[in-house]
């Protein structure tokens, strides 16, 4: 049997950094996906006593005997309950880390270890100790702020949960899960994100699982329904950033200049709320007029992010290039590098701006904003 699943990446449309200080932020799914294929061998097949993980886009393969996994991971039949998502204990995580170490990851790929640990945890908790080959490939650049780890957790969990769906209820082509299974999927994916990030907000996995857009403030997540098409150019600066240091820097600036930074955060809050209202609006306002308002909000948001100290010369280079083509851009996520969003109004031809950006060493993607969440296929 073969099961496929896919889950989208995400962008922060407005509110990054300020959300840590009580402001509203808006995030959206993008139509760049992580794909997971789950293949179960026939009982008579060779290697029906192994669990194999293939990372296609980085040409790596890992394989464990089921006997070794059972030996390493404490097994209690009562903990295997796909309908009750559970956290990975420190003890179990240490045991899983040993399994990962035994695979002799290349030094330059050690950043993959937490993702592989997450794979082993989710697989054994949801499926148990059954043989399979799991193939993962992704359209999302790793570590660029587009939610690649959450998309992995969501797509993997979707495939694992889908493997036990009755054949009678299976559809043809890509199909979404029902609300009950989506909620279960999102909870399991969040447990996976905790292994990778420690204390994630839950935003990335929620956007990836449900798709479309969400608004979040003070820990509360509200799903939004977009009523207008949005297309963005996403430019990866290829500059790595230290998210923790950037967040800390904004907090320190807020301590030094409390009144000024409070005004900045309040302004960002207003921008996020207005953006959410425009996107959800069902009034007769033309798409062109809405796009103009969104352009202005993005421009203001970028100015406020600059005042927080989280921009970077690479981000400013992208912005200057897109301005020459009469396009508006803002950083997305932590800043300090990472990715930049450029709004593409209806009818925009991007060939020339993409050519100019790529000639400067940047990586470009065009993406539709607010699309489908996790989907499965048989």
From Swiss-Prot:
Pfam families: GHMP_kinases_C, GHMP_kinases_N
Entry EC number(s): 2.7.1.36
GO cellular component, one term: cytoplasm
Cofactor: Mg(2+)
Activity regulation, per record: Its activity is inhibited in vitro by geranyl pyrophosphate (GPP) and farnesyl pyrophosphate (FPP) that bind competitively at the ATP-binding site on the enzyme.
Compartments reported by the entry: Cytoplasm
Binding site for ATP: 10, 138, 143-149
GO molecular function, one term: magnesium ion binding
Binding residues annotated for Mg(2+), in chain numbering: 149, 193
GO biological process: isopentenyl diphosphate biosynthetic process, mevalonate pathway; sterol biosynthetic process
Keyword vocabulary terms for this entry: ATP-binding, Cytoplasm, Kinase, Lipid biosynthesis, Lipid metabolism, Magnesium, Metal-binding, Nucleotide-binding, Steroid biosynthesis, Steroid metabolism, Sterol biosynthesis, Sterol metabolism, Transferase
Pathway noted in the entry: Isoprenoid biosynthesis; isopentenyl diphosphate biosynthesis via mevalonate pathway; isopentenyl diphosphate from (R)-mevalonate: step 1/3
Active site per database record: 204
Catalytic activity: (R)-mevalonate + ATP = (R)-5-phosphomevalonate + ADP + H(+)
Classification via PANTHER family: MEVALONATE KINASE
UniProt family annotation: Belongs to the GHMP kinase family. Mevalonate kinase subfamily.
Function: Catalyzes the phosphorylation of mevalonate to mevalonate 5-phosphate, a key step in isoprenoid and cholesterol biosynthesis.
Protein name stated in the entry: Mevalonate kinase
High-level lineage: Eukaryota, Viridiplantae, Streptophyta, Embryophyta, Tracheophyta
């Amino acid at each position: 049997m073969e099961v496929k699943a896919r889950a989208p990446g995400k962008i922060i449309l407005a509110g990054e950094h300020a959300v840590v200080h009580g402001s509203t932020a808006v995030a959206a799914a993008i139509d760049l996906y992580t794909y997971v294929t789950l293949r179960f061998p026939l009982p008579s097949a060779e290697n029906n006593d192994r669990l194999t993980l293939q990372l296609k886009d980085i040409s790596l393969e890992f394989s464990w005997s089921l006997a070794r996994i059972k030996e390493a991971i404490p097994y209690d039949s009562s903990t295997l309950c796909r309908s009750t998502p559970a956290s990975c204990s420190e003890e179990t995580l240490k045991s899983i880390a040993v399994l990962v170490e035994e695979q002799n990851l290349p030094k330059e790929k050690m950043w993959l270890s937490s993702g592989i640990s997450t794979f082993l945890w989710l697989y054994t908790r949801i499926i148990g100790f059954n043989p399979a080959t799991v193939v993962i490939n992704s359209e999302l650049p790793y570590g660029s702020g587009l939610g690649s780890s959450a998309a992995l957790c969501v797509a993997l969990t979707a495939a694992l949960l889908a493997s036990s769906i009755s054949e009678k209820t299976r559809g043809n082509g890509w199909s979404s899960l029902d609300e009950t299974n989506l909620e279960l999927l999102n909870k399991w994916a969040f447990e996976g994100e905790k292994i990778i990030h420690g204390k994630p907000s839950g935003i990335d996995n929620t956007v990836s699982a449900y798709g479309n857009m969400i608004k979040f403030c003070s820990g509360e997540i509200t799903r939004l329904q977009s009523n207008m098409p949005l297309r963005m150019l996403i430019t990866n600066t290829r500059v790595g950033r230290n998210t923790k240091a950037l967040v800390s820097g904004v907090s320190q600036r807020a301590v030094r200049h409390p009144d000024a930074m409070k005004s900045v955060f309040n302004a960002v809050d207003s921008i996020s709320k207005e953006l959410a209202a425009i996107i959800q609006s069902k009034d007769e306002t033309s798409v062109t007029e809405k796009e103009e308002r969104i352009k202005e909000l993005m421009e203001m948001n970028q100015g406020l992010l600059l005042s927080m100290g989280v921009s970077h010369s690479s981000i400013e280079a992208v912005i200057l290039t897109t301005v020459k083509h009469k396009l508006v851009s803002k950083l997305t996520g932590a800043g300090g590098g990472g990715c930049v969003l450029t709004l593409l109004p209806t009818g925009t031809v991007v060939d020339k701006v993409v050519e100019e950006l790529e000639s400067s060493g940047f990586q470009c993607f065009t993406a539709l904003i607010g699309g489908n969440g996790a989907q499965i296929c048989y």
